[in-house]
Amino acid sequence: MDYKTAGVDVQAGRAFIERIRSSVEATHRPEVIGGLGGFGGLIRLPAGLNKPLLVAGTDGVGTKLELAQQHQAHYGVGLDLVGMCVNDVITSGAEPLFFLDYIATGTLSPEAMAQVVEGIAEGCRRSGCALLGGETAEMPGFYDPGCYDLAGFCVAVVEEDEMIDGRKIKPGDQIIGVASSGVHSNGFSLVRKVLALTEANKNTRFGCDNKPLIETLLTPTTLYGQLVRNLLEAKVPLHGMAHITGGGLPENLPRCCPKDLVTVIDPSSWTRPELFQWLQDAGQIPEHDLWHTFNLGVGFCLVVAEEAVRDVLQVCKEQALQAWPIGQVETASPSTGERLRGLPS
């Protein structure tokens, strides 16, 4: 008996590394030292920083992976993985510096895994960060054949005196919602229950435009890193930012705001995408649960002074991203402890 008989194909692993090499190295910034193959990735801090802070984040893609694996949508979940991590760390105004990935699988499929890593590499390229290293663990008997899980790790850098942490947010500031591409990577345990209930398949269509349901659900997470970079380069004064993930607006927007302030949202200020209405109707999901599970069309929020709204909307337009003023910041009432108002209770 040998290792391959036990379920681990070392030769397939080597072929996989060679397949992804060019995609990975194409993400490398000038600060990267060396290439693939070392025990650890090496990178210098960007030149010219005085008091740099490192910002780290980690995340996965959740049970969206099951749907993606059923429909061989491997490239897209690579983009999702980067989006989930990068969109978190940029909320502090940090520049994504490098990314690491971890892939665990039952049996290594070089083609599927290469598509995943190529998606990760493309997400890193769009976000300006180096794919500095990763681990692909073949674990036969632990994961079913063809099944895999993903984890991502992103490190970003920001000057200490330029960090955005919500301290500048004040009453009267406006909240800009930036469009999501769909469900992104949260709420898929509920999505999968709805799909099972309705017996939906790859041929199922929905909405006025008769869109393919599964393809729409698997649309990759929007990457907001370039938008934030452009806003910072344009010297737009950003007071706070929030990545709208699990928990939706109610649980994520207040995270960027001081506790003595309340965010007030007007749900009529943007049009809820048809996909969420289909999910609600098909699954008979209560309105409260819908808001606390999905982004409902708003994937990222920017908190800015009122006079900066026009500039923010212009930069979003130049990035081909829809955006809307969706609310404002007010003084909180000490007696209620409310952090967010305006949404259905």
Swiss-Prot record:
Pfam families according to UniProt: AIRS, AIRS_C
Database matches in SUPFAM superfamilies: PurM C-terminal domain-like (SSF56042), PurM N-terminal domain-like (SSF55326)
Keywords, comma-separated and alphabetical: ATP-binding, Cytoplasm, Ligase, Nucleotide-binding, Purine biosynthesis
Endoplasmic reticulum as UniProt keyword: no
GO molecular function, one term: phosphoribosylformylglycinamidine cyclo-ligase activity
Protein's name in the database: Phosphoribosylformylglycinamidine cyclo-ligase
Domain of life where this protein originates: Bacteria
PANTHER family to which the protein is assigned, alphabetical: TRIFUNCTIONAL PURINE BIOSYNTHETIC PROTEIN ADENOSINE-3 (PTHR10520:SF12), TRIFUNCTIONAL PURINE BIOSYNTHETIC PROTEIN ADENOSINE-3-RELATED (PTHR10520)
A GO BP entry: 'de novo' IMP biosynthetic process
